[in-house]
Amino acid sequence: LELPIPFAPSFYKIDPSELPVLICGFAFGPVAGVLTEFVKIIIKLFLKPTSTAFVGELANFCVGCSMILPATIIYHARKSKTTAIVGCVAGTVVMTIFGTLFNAVYLLPTFAVMYGMPLDALIGMGTALNANVTDVFSFVAFCVAPLNLIKGAAVSVLTFVLYKPLSPILKTSWEASTVRKPSQTM
């Protein structure tokens, strides 16, 4: 599911796929969150092959991890509703800052080269939607940063709604699959 957004060019979409990743990270820890992020990318590639020579997938992985890691590290330091909220806010802020800088420094220039178009053409797509977009930095400030803030807030709110009911199911399933049966003696 990818939802277009009115304030950014059409190649930017809100994708709620961080939701199961954050839930998994809350349930099983930061490493599990990163591994789930990686598996998410692999599944996406099986369902829909890359159209960006893996640059988009790299971006999705890195930006996703920039939210998941702070959120889950903070939550696992002392599991409570407060640390979940602080973790999600921190994760959203880190994702917004990292995603904005990553787009400005690496992704936009790489996509421009990859698609054989001047960087100004990409900036022009942002200008067509918002007259305040005049360069790379205003592009990421008015198009990328709001996208990441909205995505982080949406994933965080949905995680708060879904985590508590899913947590016992996830943990019971995990415990059942990892319990070793005593060996039988013959």
Task: Please report, for each region that a protein language model flagged, where it lies by residue.
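Membrane-embedded alpha-helical segments of multi-pass membrane proteins
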Residues: 15-23, 58-66, 153
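Hydrophobic alpha-helical transmembrane segments
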Residues: 19, 34-38, 57-62, 85-90, ...
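Membrane-embedded alpha-helical hairpins and interfacial helices in multi-pass inner-membrane proteins
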Residues: 3-15, 54, 78-185
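Alpha-helical transmembrane segments and their immediate interhelical/interface regions
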Residues: 48-86
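Alpha-helical transmembrane segments and their lipid-water interface positions
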Residues: 36, 40, 47, 67-71, ...
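Hydrophobic transmembrane alpha-helices
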Residues: 1-27, 31-36, 52, 67-75, 159, 163, ...
